Amino acid sequence: QEINYNVMFSQRGVMNLAHNLQDVRDLKRRTHANRLNGIDAVYLSTEEVKKFCPIINTSQDIRYPVLGGTLQRRAGTARHDAVAWGYARGADEMGVDIIQNCEVKGIKRNGDEVEGIETTKGFIKTKKVGVVAAGHSSVLANMAGLRLPLESKPLQALVSEPVKPIIDTVVMSNAVHAYVSQSDKGELVIGAGTDDYVSYSQKGSHDIVEGTLNAIL
C-alpha cells in the first residue's frame, strides 16, 4: 500500500521443520519469542505438520525425520521482480532518476573528496555517492579507497517446470539447508543456503542444483 504497487504477496504461511532435538528446542524458543512480540506463530507436532502439508514425508525411519515444526500463517511470498518495480516506481515519484543498464566503472576523487562517477553511459558529476549494490558493495567502495568488512557469497535458487498444485505453503528446513514453495504458474521454487566459497560470480553450478534437490527430497 505504501508504494501503491501489487507485489503479488501471497500469505500462504511459512513452516520451518524440526529434524532433531536441538531443532525442536530452537524452534520452540523462536515461537515463544514471536508470541511475546505479538506474532501469531505456533509450534506443530509431527501429525499437525502432515495435516497442514500432506506432501511432507513424516515417516520416522528416514534420514531426517520430522519431529515437528513452526508455522506463521500470515507469512508468505512476494514476487521479487514486483517488489523491485514497486520500489523503483516509488523512488521515481519522489524525484529519483533511475538509469537502467548503466554500470559504474570508477569513482573520480580529489584527495578524500568525491567529484563524480564514471559509468558506461558517461560521467556523472556529484559530491555524494550512496553504495547499495548488495554483494558488489565492497567492489564499489574499493573504487573510493574504502575496504568494507564484507564477504560476498553466491546464493542460488532454481525453479522446476510447471506441475500440478502439490504444496500451498512455504516449507523450510535448517537441517538440510533448503526451502520449497510453488508459484502461481505451478513451478516449484527451490533454494538453499549460501555457497561455501567467497565469490562475485552470478552463474549457477550443477553441484549446487543437485545438492539442493537432494535436500528437499
Residue ranges of model-derived segments:
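A general structural signal for well-ordered alpha-helical segments in protein cores
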Residues: 1, 24-27, 46, 83-84, ...
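Dinucleotide-binding Rossmann-like beta1-alpha1 core, especially the glycine-rich loop
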Residues: 1-55, 198
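Short beta-strand
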Residues: 6-10, 150, 171, 180-181
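Conserved hydrophobic/aromatic beta-strand scaffold that supports enzyme active sites
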Residues: 16, 116, 157-159, 179
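A short, glycine/Asx- and small/polar-enriched loop/turn
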Residues: 22-25, 51-66, 108-115
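Helical element adjacent to the flavin cofactor pocket in flavoenzyme catalytic cores
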Residues: 69-128
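Central helical "cap/lid" subdomain
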Residues: 119-168
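Active-site lid/adjacent beta-loop-alpha segment flanking the redox-cofactor pocket in flavoenzymes
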Residues: 162-217
